[in-house]
Design a protein with these regions (language model features):
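Membrane-embedded transmembrane alpha-helical bundles that form the catalytic cores
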Residues: 1-202
C-alpha cells in the first residue's frame, strides 16, 4: 500500500514529489504491473489446473532478461506471440533484408503501444521499445559484443522502467514526471530507495 501511494502520487496528477520518490516510482512501477498482472494469471492457471486443463504461461521472469528481445520473450507472452504471428511475420518479419526488418519492428511495436491505449503516450511507449530493438540489431550487425550479463540485466531493467513513464494518464502527465525529476533539487528522504533496493534484490 505504501508503494502504491508513492507510485500513484507520481503517475497520477502532475507530480510534486522529491527526486527519490520519483526515482523509486520509476523503478518500481513495472514491478507492480508485473506482480499484479502475473499474479492474476497465475491464479487463473492454478484454477485451470484444478479443473483439469492447463493454461499457457504468460510471464516468465521478465526482469531476468539480459536484453530487450529476451524481455519480450518473457513479458506478456500471449500478446508478444500475437504481435509476432499476426503483425510482424505477415509484414515480412526478418526475411526481406535488414532495413525492412527494422521497419517491421517499429510498426509491430507501434501497434503494440496502441493496443494498450489510444493515447499518444502509449504510441510513444511502443515506438521506444521498437526503436531500442532496432538499435540493438544495428549494434549486433556491426559486431558489437554483448555487455556483461549483470550489466546487461541492469541496463535492460533501467530502459524498461524508463519507458513505463509513458503509461502515465496522458502524455502531458508523462512529460510532467520527466520535468519534475529533471527540476528536482532536493533528493528527499532515501527511505523509499532503501526499501526498493530490498525489493529488487529479492526479484533479481
Amino acid at each position: 500500500a505504501y508503494y502504491s501511494d508513492v507510485i500513484s502520487g507520481v503517475y497520477g496528477d502532475e507530480p510534486e514529489s522529491s527526486a527519490a520518490q520519483i526515482l523509486a516510482a520509476l523503478l518500481l512501477y513495472g514491478v507492480v504491473l508485473y506482480t499484479n498482472f502475473s499474479g492474476f494469471i497465475d491464479m487463473a492457471r492454478a484454477l485451470g489446473l484444478a479443473m483439469g486443463f492447463k493454461l499457457p504461461q504468460n510471464f516468465n521472469m521478465p526482469y531476468a532478461a539480459k536484453n530487450l528481445g529476451e524481455f519480450w520473450d518473457r513479458w506478456h507472452i500471449s500478446l508478444s506471440t500475437f504481435i509476432r504471428d499476426y503483425i510482424y511475420i505477415p509484414l515480412g518479419g526478418s526475411r526481406r533484408g535488414f532495413a525492412r526488418t527494422c521497419v517491421n519492428l517499429l510498426i509491430a511495436f507501434a501497434l503494440s503501444g496502441i493496443w494498450h491505449g489510444a493515447g499518444l503516450n502509449f504510441l510513444i511507449w511502443g515506438l521506444l521499445h521498437g526503436a531500442a530493438l532496432v538499435f540493438l540489431k544495428c549494434l549486433a550487425k556491426v559486431g558489437v559484443k554483448p555487455l556483461n550479463p549483470y550489466l546487461a540485466l541492469f541496463c535492460t531493467y533501467i530502459f524498461v522502467s524508463f519507458a513505463w513513464i509513458f503509461f502515465a494518464n496522458s502524455l502531458p502527465d508523462a512529460a510532467a514526471i520527466l520535468g519534475a525529476f529533471a527540476r528536482a533539487r532536493a533528493f528527499g528522504d532515501i527511505s523509499e530507495l532503501a526499501v526498493l533496493a530490498v525489493i529488487l534484490a529479492g526479484i533479481f
